């Protein structure tokens, strides 16, 4: 298997699809990388040459923040928002939607499972 940015890529997939397995690289960015390095999109990972793999690995490490570094960066940004006591930080702290979504209904993903209060035992 090919390891790029600490992530093993599936060998039977096309290169542009396989690069999406790296956190921080989506479809658009993977195609942009391959265009820059002049690698054919339809090439399978197992058919890549050693030089192409090295070029892709070096290009990603040099130009993008990916995988654990990106996760750490995002986590530190959220912690900073909580520390400075901003509105977004408060919403993160209370585990509520951050970007202005309504919470009276339709916030189950963020708020968790609905708890039904049993009033019979009171």
From Swiss-Prot:
It comes from Cyanidium caldarium (Red alga). One of its GO terms (cellular component) is small ribosomal subunit. Belongs to the universal ribosomal protein uS13 family. It is found in: Plastid, Chloroplast. It comes from the Eukaryota. GO terms for biological process: translation. One of its GO terms (molecular function) is rRNA binding. Keywords: Chloroplast, Plastid, Ribonucleoprotein, Ribosomal protein, RNA-binding, rRNA-binding. NCBIfam families: uS13_bact. This is Small ribosomal subunit protein uS13c. Part of the 30S ribosomal subunit. Located at the top of the head of the 30S subunit, it contacts several helices of the 16S rRNA.
């Amino acid at each position: 298997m090919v390891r790029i940015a600490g992530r093993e890529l599936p060998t039977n997939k096309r290169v542009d699809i396989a690069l999406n397995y790296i956190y921080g690289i989506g479809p658009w960015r993977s195609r942009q990388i391959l265009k820059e390095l002049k690698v054919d999109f339809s090439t399978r990972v197992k058919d890549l040459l050693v030089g192409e793999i090295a070029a892709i690995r070096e290009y990603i490490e040099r130009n993008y923040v990916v995988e654990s570094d990106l996760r750490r960066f995002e986590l530190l940004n959220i912690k900073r928002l909580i520390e400075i006591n901003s509105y977004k930080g408060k919403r993160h702290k209370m585990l509520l939607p951050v970007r202005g979504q309504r919470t009276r209904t339709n916030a189950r993903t963020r708020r968790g499972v609905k708890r039904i209060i049993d009033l019979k035992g009171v």
